[in-house]
């Protein structure tokens, strides 16, 4: 869908069935840098899901493209070729009969197409490495991930965060699901904790989570530093005076081609470098006993 936003505040895309039942309601609110998602069933709005944007790709007077991809489990939404969020099906998608678009936009085109991948590779617009630190952030690795690699990330946690994540994954696509040898997910709501996991070791699903308490330096509103150390058979994540539990690798790191960062973090620095195995080897060795 190609559209141009007029000088106003919001617009709506609805996927409808029956007598004005809304299986998926997408409502970008430009004045709030916020995109609402919901359903409207039997005359009642469901629980709203929201997505806040530090820098919105939807700007007054500027053209843009939205893609809504229907997967087995959810609607996947990208803007200008960049995946933004998903919305789990509350109504079987095959019930949808029509699309409704209205609000403060100048609609240029709308189409229904079939695709085997999402986002569509022909419209993916990842910047070259280091051109931008805006989230969602993709880094296309130019060589295989090897023991001795260190990933340095610096930024500031948003004041009212829900979560942010860092994936070391096999492809740039959201669908089909990439292999993810390492997944770091920092969660703030409804509970605060850190998850380390992988996707694809036990089949087409998430594997067993390793949970740990949230480091104080990753508290809402604080500047944070994330250092990820790659070893032969495990990964170690640490800050200035703490470390997460060692994550034993379940999948071959040779499959990692991209680093993906998304969520409630304003990133200010990203770098891949190497490290010498010194005192952090001692920490890992102690945990692995």
For each predicted feature, which ranges?
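Peripheral membrane interaction modules
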Residues: 1-65, 69, 73-78, 82-225, ...
């Amino acid at each position: 869908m190609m559209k141009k936003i007029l000088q106003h505040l919001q617009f709506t895309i609805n996927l409808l069935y029956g007598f004005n039942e809304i299986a998926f309601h997408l409502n970008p609110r430009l004045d709030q840098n916020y995109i609402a998602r919901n359903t409207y069933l039997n005359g009642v709005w469901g629980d709203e899901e929201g997505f806040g944007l530090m820098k919105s790709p939807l700007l007054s007077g500027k053209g843009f493209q939205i893609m809504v991809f229907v997967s087995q489990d959810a609607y996947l939404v990208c803007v200008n070729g960049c995946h933004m969020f998903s919305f789990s099906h509350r109504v079987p998608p095959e019930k949808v009969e029509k699309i409704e678009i209205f609000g403060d936009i100048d609609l240029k085109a709308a189409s229904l197409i079939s695709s085997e991948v999402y986002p569509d590779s022909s419209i993916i617009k990842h910047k070259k490495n280091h051109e931008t630190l805006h989230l969602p952030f993709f880094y296309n690795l130019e060589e295989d991930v090897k023991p001795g690699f260190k990933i340095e990330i610096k930024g500031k946690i948003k004041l009212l965060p829900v979560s942010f994540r860092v994936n070391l994954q096999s492809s740039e696509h959201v669908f089909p699901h990439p292999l993810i040898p390492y997944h770091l997910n920092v969660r703030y709501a409804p509970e605060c904790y850190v998850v380390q996991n992988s996707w694809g070791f036990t089949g087409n699903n998430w594997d067993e989570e390793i949970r740990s308490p949230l480091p104080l330096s990753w508290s809402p509103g604080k500047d944070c530093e994330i250092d990820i150390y790659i070893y032969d058979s495990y990964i170690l994540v640490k800050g200035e005076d703490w470390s997460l539990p060692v994550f034993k690798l379940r999948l071959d790191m040779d499959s990692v081609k991209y680093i993906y960062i998304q969520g409630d973090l304003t990133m200010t620095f990203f770098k891949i470098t190497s490290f010498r195995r010194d005192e952090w080897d001692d920490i890992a060795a102690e945990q692995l006993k």
